[in-house]
């Protein structure tokens, strides 16, 4: 059958005459057209499904790419600053170690007690007590509490406190208590104070 005759037969076909329950009785040209349409529909659906799947994969890969870019940027920044960070940490450790080594050793503590006593006597005070209390160990240093009790005038006490704070070694003052020596008299005052100096703890630093 020629193409012209096929087209002519299609024009003569009434769709209402086609029996859906008996597709085999349909004209050959109609069968071919239906097959072509069904094939095209199947291909279109499959192509659309494939495109949707590819789109989802592309979006997932794009998100993963963005995450990898951020990770790379962070690691690149860390790598660029790693040497500077190491140098800074080394400098801090050296400075901290140097500061700790300025603390008095065991052999220097008696000299510190002499300095405190000399400062008090030079301020016009009378010592009632100056004694070392039990040590308190910390990680990098050891506290050496010193209980001090002195008697003198108000300005003499102030001069003593200022002098102790100015000593070359680190000394901190705590728990001030000032009372008149005689009830009702302010000419002589008794001051009890806890001084703390700090000894270098080389064992703690090595840890």
Curated annotation (Swiss-Prot):
Q: Sorted alphabetically, which Pfam families does this protein's record hold?
A: PilO
Q: How does this protein sit in the membrane?
A: Single-pass type II membrane protein
Q: Where in the cell is it found?
A: Cell inner membrane
One of the GO BP terms on file: type IV pilus assembly
From the record, give the transmembrane residue ranges.
Answer: 26-46
Taken from the UniProt entry, a GO cellular component term is: plasma membrane
| Keywords from the named record | Cell inner membrane, Cell membrane, Membrane, Transmembrane, Transmembrane helix
Top-level lineage group: Bacteria
The UniProt record lists the keyword ATP-binding = no
Q: Quaternary structure?
A: Interacts with PilN. Interacts with PilP (via N-terminus). Interacts with PilM.
UniProt function note: Inner membrane component of the type IV (T4S) secretion system that plays a role in surface and host cell adhesion, colonization, biofilm maturation, virulence, and twitching, a form of surface-associated motility. PilN/PilO heterodimers form the foundation of the inner-membrane PilM/PilN/PilO/PilP complex which plays an essential role in the assembly of a functional T4 pilus.
Name the UniProt record assigns to this protein: Type IV pilus inner membrane component PilO
Q: Which organism is it from?
A: Pseudomonas aeruginosa (strain ATCC 15692 / DSM 22644 / CIP 104116 / JCM 14847 / LMG 12228 / 1C / PRS 101 / PAO1)
């Amino acid at each position: 059958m020629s193409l012209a005759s096929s087209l002519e037969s299609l024009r003569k076909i009434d769709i209402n005459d086609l029996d859906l329950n008996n597709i085999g009785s349909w004209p050959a040209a109609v069968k071919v057209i239906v097959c072509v349409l069904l094939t095209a529909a199947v291909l279109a659906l499959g192509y659309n499904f494939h495109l949707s799947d590819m789109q989802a994969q592309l979006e997932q890969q794009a998100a993963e790419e963005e995450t990898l870019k951020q990770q790379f940027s962070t690691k690149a920044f860390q790598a660029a600053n790693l040497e500077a960070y190491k140098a800074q940490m080394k400098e801090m450790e050296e400075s901290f170690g140097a500061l700790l080594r300025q603390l008095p050793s065991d052999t220097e503590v008696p000299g510190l007690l002499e300095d405190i006593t000399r400062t008090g006597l030079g301020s016009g005070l009378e010592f009632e007590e100056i004694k070392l209390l039990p040590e308190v160990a910390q990680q990098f240093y050891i506290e050496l509490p010193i209980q001090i009790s002195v008697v003198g005038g108000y300005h003499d006490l102030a001069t003593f406190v200022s002098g102790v704070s100015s000593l070359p070694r680190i000394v901190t003052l705590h728990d001030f208590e000032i009372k008149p020596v005689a009830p009702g008299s302010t000419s002589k005052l008794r001051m009890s104070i806890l001084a703390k100096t700090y000894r270098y703890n080389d064992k703690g630093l090595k840890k």
